[in-house]
């Protein structure tokens, strides 16, 4: 049984979050949580929270055994970018893009 959890509009760029997602794809959930705990990146904490949510969803909604679960799929899509202005010298301004992403984790007992 596949169970999904999503974090939409996460305040990290998709490029940075994909680095973390690649570390745990296909792993058992216990091993994935261990990897994320010791990964020194902001995105690791965000991905860990989504993974814990997916595990809880599988346990509560589907009655799955946590020991059998593995990360079947994990992907990070780009969300909308917030546009901000940074003043520069001589009356100019630069545009700053505050990027967001949508993190999706699918756990399965198969």
Curated annotation (Swiss-Prot):
<keyword id="KW-0694">RNA-binding</keyword>
<dbReference type="InterPro" id="IPR018260">
    <property type="entry name" value="Ribosomal_uL22_CS"/>
</dbReference>
<dbReference type="GO" id="GO:0006412">
    <property type="term" value="P:translation"/>
</dbReference>
<dbReference type="GO" id="GO:0022625">
    <property type="term" value="C:cytosolic large ribosomal subunit"/>
</dbReference>
<dbReference type="InterPro" id="IPR047867">
    <property type="entry name" value="Ribosomal_uL22_bac/org-type"/>
</dbReference>
<dbReference type="InterPro" id="IPR036394">
    <property type="entry name" value="Ribosomal_uL22_sf"/>
</dbReference>
<keyword id="KW-0687">Ribonucleoprotein</keyword>
<keyword id="KW-0689">Ribosomal protein</keyword>
<comment type="similarity">
    <text>Belongs to the universal ribosomal protein uL22 family.</text>
</comment>
<protein>
    <recommendedName>
        <fullName>Large ribosomal subunit protein uL22</fullName>
    </recommendedName>
</protein>
<dbReference type="Pfam" id="PF00237">
    <property type="entry name" value="Ribosomal_L22"/>
</dbReference>
<dbReference type="InterPro" id="IPR005727">
    <property type="entry name" value="Ribosomal_uL22_bac/chlpt-type"/>
</dbReference>
<dbReference type="InterPro" id="IPR001063">
    <property type="entry name" value="Ribosomal_uL22"/>
</dbReference>
<comment type="subunit">
    <text>Part of the 50S ribosomal subunit.</text>
</comment>
<dbReference type="GO" id="GO:0003735">
    <property type="term" value="F:structural constituent of ribosome"/>
</dbReference>
<dbReference type="GO" id="GO:0019843">
    <property type="term" value="F:rRNA binding"/>
</dbReference>
<comment type="function">
    <text>This protein binds specifically to 23S rRNA; its binding is stimulated by other ribosomal proteins, e.g. L4, L17, and L20. It is important during the early stages of 50S assembly. It makes multiple contacts with different domains of the 23S rRNA in the assembled 50S subunit and ribosome.</text>
</comment>
<keyword id="KW-0699">rRNA-binding</keyword>
<comment type="function">
    <text>The globular domain of the protein is located near the polypeptide exit tunnel on the outside of the subunit, while an extended beta-hairpin is found that lines the wall of the exit tunnel in the center of the 70S ribosome.</text>
</comment>
